[in-house]
Structures are given as structure tokens and as C-alpha cells.
Amino acid sequence: MAVQLTQLSAIDAITKALAKKPYRVDVVGPWGSAKSVVAAQAAAALDRPLLFLCAGRIEAEAVYDDLATFAGEERVALFPAWEVLPSDTMNPSDDIVAERMDTLRRLANALDAGERLLVVMPIRSLLQRVVARKHLIDDMLSLEVGQEIDLDLLLERLIKLGYTREVMVENRGDVSVRGGIVDIFPISAELPCRFEFFGDEIESIRRFEPETQRSVGDEKRIQILPRSEKSLLTRLESKEGGLEALSAYLPDNTLVVIDEPPAVLEEAHIVEKQASGNKHVMTWVEAEAAIDRFAQIHLAQVA
């Protein structure tokens, strides 16, 4: 549940200043959670989506917690960075892939629906190229109650998406089939889903706890993403328009808030050096150009 706060007196001045070119406002003084309040209230006053950029993961997680409190968790998304790149031999953790893929899914849907999401990320996440929105949507499997789909074709599609057939669903990426019941643990979900079929028709969709098999809620529609973001990126990296900056998922009226710009710039240069020449990572100049079309607020505790 969102917590209602009295609007800061500076918000009117900030929103008026953002109406004038070059659509950038420097705000000096707020610290800690006050920065999140400024961002949330400015986005609300302007009725715009928000992209909040931080120097690092710890800062981003703190801002995410703040915004989830102020605006409601259902409106806020965290986009963590890969701890390893797609070109590395190691695979990223499922938790990071799940959060990244779910945020991309939500952004892809929000752009069509006009939903105003508040997205928080470290600068490292912005520098890492993502699957182009078009390709993510093309590879997304949508299933809803009342839909008719052949069970064999469904299983074939899930296998192509990288899911593994198991006797029982326990981990993300698992799928099991028992008669007219199909259990799927989507990579972007916290809990698996149970699809009950009558013939080829989906009669019900329920979330359930894998340990107890207890149902915890009904769903009308589920979107299932490819099991591996790494495989998706690798497959599309040589395709023209296969990868893009995350900013391409954002509406033109997005408000970008940069927390402590010097620290963000310093971290961006560190990432550049670490990934020099890697096609999965943009330079700061490229990233800056990608967000230049958005109105911006730069926050600093001291001048």
C-alpha cells in the first residue's frame, strides 16, 4: 500500500523549470530517502513514468524500497545489472535473470498500455544492452483462461523457450505435464503456475507453492518469457536491431532522475574500462545520448 506524503514545496518550482528547455533541473540538498520523495512527487505531479539512475546496486535497492513505500510496490520495478556478461562462460543467477526479465516484460506491456512505471537501476544496468522490445514480445508466450491450445504444441513451445520437462516443478524453468494439468515455473515469476485443461481449453490458472502444492491465488492471464536471457542475447547479438538500449522501452515523456551525477559518471567509466570493446555494453557517451531525449532531474546532497 502506498504511503501518502505532503507534497514538498519545491515540487512546483521543479515541474515549472522542467517545462523550459533544456528540460533539466539540478536539485541540491536532499539526502537519503528525501531524494526518493523528490523523484516520486515530481513524477506524480507531471503524471509521467520515472527512470531513477543510481551509481551502484546498494543505492538502487534503497531507492526501490523507498519508492515501493511511497507509490506502491505494484508500480515500481528494479532492474539489476548482470554480474557477468553474456560473453562470459559463467551464467548469471536465476534471481537476477528473473528480476531483469520481469522488469523488461512490465516495461514492454506498460508502453502499450500507457502505464506509468517507476523503474530504478544502477548505471551499470543502463550501460548493458538488452533484447530489443520487438523480439522480447515475439518470444513471449501468453496464456489465458478460456484459450484453446494443443498440449503437445504447448510443451513443444515451452521446450523451445528453454524450459525443461521434469516430474515435478521445483525451480524456475521447470515444466511438468500430468494428464490435463500442466505446471510451469516461469523464469520471471516468484511462484509456479498450474494450468488445468478441459480438452484443449485452459479452464483455470493458479499460482501454487512448490513445496506444499497449495494454491495461493487465481490468475486470468500469464506471460511466459524465454528461460535464458543469456541465450536470447547471444542469439540476437548479430541480428540488426536485435539488441538495444533499455531506454528504447521507455515512453518519450519519461522523467529521468540521476542521483549524484559525478558518482554515476565515475561508475560508468569503471564499467567502460572493464568491458572495453564488448558489444553488449555501451559507452557512457552512448548511454547519455540514449537518455538525452528525456526531461531530467539531477540530485545532489551538496553542490
Describe the function of each predicted region.
Residues 1-303:
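ASCE RecA-like P-loop NTPase motor cores
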